[in-house]
A protein has these predicted regions:
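Ala/Thr-enriched low-complexity intrinsically disordered regions
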Residues: 8-9, 16
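Intrinsically disordered, low-complexity regulatory segments enriched in Ser/Thr/Pro
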Residues: 98, 102-125
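Amphipathic, interaction-prone secondary-structure segments
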Residues: 72-103
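Well-ordered alpha/beta subsegment
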Residues: 123-149
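Short histidine-centered catalytic/ligand-binding loop motif
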Residues: 40-48, 116-127
Length: 149
């Protein structure tokens, strides 16, 4: 695999500085891990505004119940949860759209969801049980599609 080009050649990329691999060292303000309770609405607003303006990417650990909210890519949240002890097979990515209501606020799509070994051959979460668990944890840790202040 060829090496990645330098950041100047890819201004949209945020590469970790040399010798700093942990997400906390290079994107501490861009990801919030919620282990219990719900993320504060002002913090969620900050993350929505920081990256995409109308949505936020997040990753759910369906076994431990933790959720990593934020980041430019789902892989950022995945890395955050892996560093905290999650197992990769338990991590699923989705997008949250505040203000769309309960039925429209979750998009179950992410590149990290492509895993043929687990029977998921698509970016979208295909297993109904996994989708339901992601939905439960989204409502418990992030929100139910209500508008943000």
């Amino acid at each position: 695999m060829p090496p990645l080009p330098p950041p100047a050649a890819n201004p949209g990329w945020r590469l970790a500085p040399p010798g700093r691999r942990r997400y906390k060292d290079w994107m501490p303000e861009g990801i919030v891990v919620v282990r219990d309770g719900r993320i504060e609405s002002r913090e969620l607003r900050r993350l929505v505004d920081l990256f995409f303006e109308d949505m936020v990417k997040y990753v759910v650990d369906v076994e431990r119940g933790a959720v990593a909210v934020g980041g430019e890519m789902h892989a950022d949240g995945e890395e955050a949860l892996l560093e905290e002890g999650s197992r990769q097979p338990d991590l699923w990515g989705a997008n949250y759209y505040p203000g769309r209501g309960r039925e429209e606020c979750i998009e179950y799509t992410s590149l990290i969801n492509i895993r043929p070994a687990q029977g998921n051959r698509s970016m979208e979460i295909q297993d109904p049980a996994v989708r339901e668990r992601v939905r439960e944890l989204t409502f418990a840790r992030i929100g139910e599609g209500e508008a943000l202040p």
